[in-house]
Amino acid sequence: MAGGQRLKRMADSVQRELSELIRQELKDPRLGGLVTISGVKVSPDLGYADVYVTVMGRELSDDQNEVAHRETLDILNKASGFLRQELSRRIKTRITPRLRFHYDKTNAYGNYMFGLIEKAVQDLPKRESDDKE
């Protein structure tokens, strides 16, 4: 079993090295846009690493965006064996975790919340003028 600090160090190493590997070694033309690793969570036994990714640089509709994210996750999950092998060469540990890629929805949720706040701020003067009458 690994301690909390060790898990954090391992997650940070995996995130740093995977970011570099995806940028430099993964040459799939279907990976349009910038794939960013927003976080990594390593299981206590170091058997798995859940990798959370976002895709930036694509201006698409919501439906197209969802399809693009799914396609990106499929590409990354299919390349996970290669990425794990390369990762094991870069980080010198006895166990290299299996990689599971997930889409990180925090950016999308943040944009959604920002839109709601912006709409509320725009409606505020309208409501104040209605209250005065």
From Swiss-Prot:
GO BP: maturation of SSU-rRNA
Keywords: Cytoplasm, Ribosome biogenesis
InterPro entries reported for this sequence: KH_dom-like_a/b, RbfA, RbfA_dom_sf
Pfam families in alphabetical order: RBFA
Family (UniProt): Belongs to the RbfA family.
Complexes and interactors: Monomer. Binds 30S ribosomal subunits, but not 50S ribosomal subunits or 70S ribosomes.
HAMAP family, per database record: RbfA
Record PANTHER family: RIBOSOME-BINDING FACTOR A, CHLOROPLASTIC-RELATED
Protein name: Ribosome-binding factor A
Organism field: Acinetobacter baumannii (strain ACICU)
Gene (UniProt): rbfA
